[in-house]
């Protein structure tokens, strides 16, 4: 056959697939046609109103007199007498809530029409109301948009300024580092950096002070000097409690750097340092480290004051032999023997510093506890005083109110007397 067995049929919005065979097509069409177009009433038959189209679903009032006269036929079953169709919830919702009409006798069909017209009027009113509401909302939204438009412009200004600030900061890292240092300085910051000469001594001093605190940072330093001196610095690193991984850099002699690093490593936890070739780079790094360290320990700055005095003397003595070794690179053996002596001295100094720190830490702890206790006591006293003052104030207020009331009462009595007299 040329006609396909199954067809995809779509009805309105419903896009579901309905396979219809050739045999059942006729009955299927008949059924659906009857749904769309109801059959015309047969002549001589009364039209029965459907309960789904009536709002009152109350049980019909049965007149017993009429039933007595007109009895239902014997063959009719009780289930057939009842109307099986339930009132449709869908139609009720469509119509809207309409007050239940009185029970109609014969003119039931007329009442249905009136209900429908009422419902249509109601729906029209609702639609109008909705439209008005929507328009009002739109107007308010427009107003808010107009008012809100200047606000973002104001907000943009600080953003631009922030960007400018960012550019400035990226241009001068050194300045920023200085500012950080200034803001986060504790009362007892060491001020002995300037005493050293303009050579590596300055770098060493700043690094040393940074490393005296318990926690340090990691360092990469790249080398251009002799291999013998590098080897010496590596040996020294291993000798300390917790050594650091060093790659030595710069335009100056590696021996000088080794000397300065050695002193720094005597503290509890050593750090791995990034040191750039130029002096400014070294100073920046030192200042940033100091800023971080100040955050962590305020107490450590006191310890540095004690340690720097001893370290400076040792550093100045060590710098002289190291400078000679840098001038003549052949005298590596002599410097090695000196380094051995310096290591021993450093270890001794480290032990002394450790003992001092332990003592100071205990004393600091006691002090802090005492301070806390004093603060608490002061606060308690203040609270008690405040409570007392509050109570007194309340009493005063009550007294004032009472006095006012008494005065008012007296005045009222006086007025009444005057009126009576008149």
UniProtKB/Swiss-Prot annotation:
Which residues, if any, are the signal sequence?
none
Write out the GO MF terms. structural constituent of cytoskeleton
The disulfides recorded in the entry are: none
Where composition is biased (Polar residues), the residues are 50-59
Region described as Disordered: 39-59, 101-422
Region annotated 3 X approximate tandem repeats, chain positions: 179-263
Q: Where is the composition biased (Basic and acidic residues)?
A: 118-149, 157-178, 191-298, 310-368
> Which Pfam families has this protein been placed in?
Cylicin_N
Q: Where is the composition biased (Basic residues)?
A: 179-190, 369-388, 398-422
Q: What is its main location?
A: cytoplasm
- List GO terms (cellular component aspect): cytoskeletal calyx
How is expression of this protein distributed across tissues? Testis.
Q: Which UniProt keywords apply?
A: Cytoplasm, Cytoskeleton, Developmental protein, Differentiation, Repeat, Spermatogenesis
Which sections of the protein are sequence repeats? 179-205, 206-232, 233-263
Where in or outside the cell?
Answer: Cytoplasm, Cytoskeleton, Perinuclear theca, Calyx; Cytoplasm, Cytoskeleton, Perinuclear theca
Null allele outcome, as annotated, is: CYLC2-knockout male mice are infertile. Knockout spermatozoa show morphological defects of the head, altered nuclear shape, acrosome malformations, acrosome detachment from the nuclear envelope, abnormal manchette elongation, bending of the neck region, and/or coiling of the flagellum. Sperm motility is markedly reduced.
InterPro entries named in the record: CYLC, Cylicin_N
Q: GO biological process annotations for this chain's record?
A: acrosome assembly; maintenance of cell number; manchette assembly; manchette disassembly; single fertilization; spermatogenesis
Functional description taken from the UniProt entry: Plays a role in the establishment of normal sperm morphology during spermatogenesis. It is required for acrosome attachment to the nuclear envelope, and proper manchette elongation and disassembly.
Protein name as it appears in the record: Cylicin-2
């Amino acid at each position: 056959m040329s006609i396909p067995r199954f067809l995809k049929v779509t009805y309105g919005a419903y896009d579901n697939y309905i396979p219809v065979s050739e045999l059942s097509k006729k009955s299927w069409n008949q059924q659906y046609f009857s749904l769309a177009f109801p059959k015309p009433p047969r002549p001589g038959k009364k039209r029965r109103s459907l309960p789904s189209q009536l709002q009152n679903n109350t049980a019909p009032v049965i007149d017993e007199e009429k039933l007595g006269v007109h009895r239902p036929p014997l063959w009719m079953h009780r289930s057939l007498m009842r109307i099986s169709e339930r009132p449709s919830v869908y139609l009720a919702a469509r119509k809207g809530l309409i007050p239940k009409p009185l029970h109609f006798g014969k003119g039931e069909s007329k009442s249905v029409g009136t209900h429908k017209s009422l419902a249509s009027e109601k729906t029209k009113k609702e639609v109008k109301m909705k439209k008005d509401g929507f328009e009002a909302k739109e107007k308010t939204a427009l107003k808010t948009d107009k008012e809100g438009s200047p606000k973002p412009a104001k907000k943009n200004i600080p953003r631009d300024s922030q960007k400018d600030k960012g550019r400035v900061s990226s241009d001068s890292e050194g300045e920023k580092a200085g500012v950080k240092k200034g803001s986060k300085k504790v009362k007892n910051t060491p001020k002995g950096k300037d005493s050293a000469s303009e050579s590596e001594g300055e770098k060493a001093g700043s690094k040393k002070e940074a490393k005296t605190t318990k926690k340090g940072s990691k360092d990469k330093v790249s080398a251009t000097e002799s291999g013998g001196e590098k080897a010496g610095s590596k040996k020294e690193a291993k000798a300390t409690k917790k050594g650091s991984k060093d790659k030595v850099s710069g335009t100056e002699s590696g021996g000088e750097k080794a000397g300065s690093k050695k002193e720094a490593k005597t503290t509890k936890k050593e750090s791995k340092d990034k040191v750039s070739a130029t002096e400014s780079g070294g100073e920046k790094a030192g200042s940033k480290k100091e800023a971080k360290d100040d955050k962590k320990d305020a107490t450590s700055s006191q310890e540095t004051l004690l340690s720097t005095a001893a370290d400076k003397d040792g550093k100045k003595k060590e710098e002289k032999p190291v400078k000679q070794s840098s001038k003549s690179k052949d005298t590596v053996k002599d410097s090695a023997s000196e380094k051995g002596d310096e290591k021993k001295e450093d270890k001794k100094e480290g032990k002394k510093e450790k003992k001092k720190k332990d003592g100071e830490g205990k004393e600091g702890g006691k002090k802090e506890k005492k301070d806390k206790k004093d603060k608490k006591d002061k606060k308690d006293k203040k609270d008690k005083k405040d409570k007392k003052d509050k109570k007194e104030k309340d009493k005063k207020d009550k007294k004032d109110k009472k006095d006012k009331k008494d005065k008012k009462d007296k005045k009222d009595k006086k007025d009444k007397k005057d009126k009576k007299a008149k």
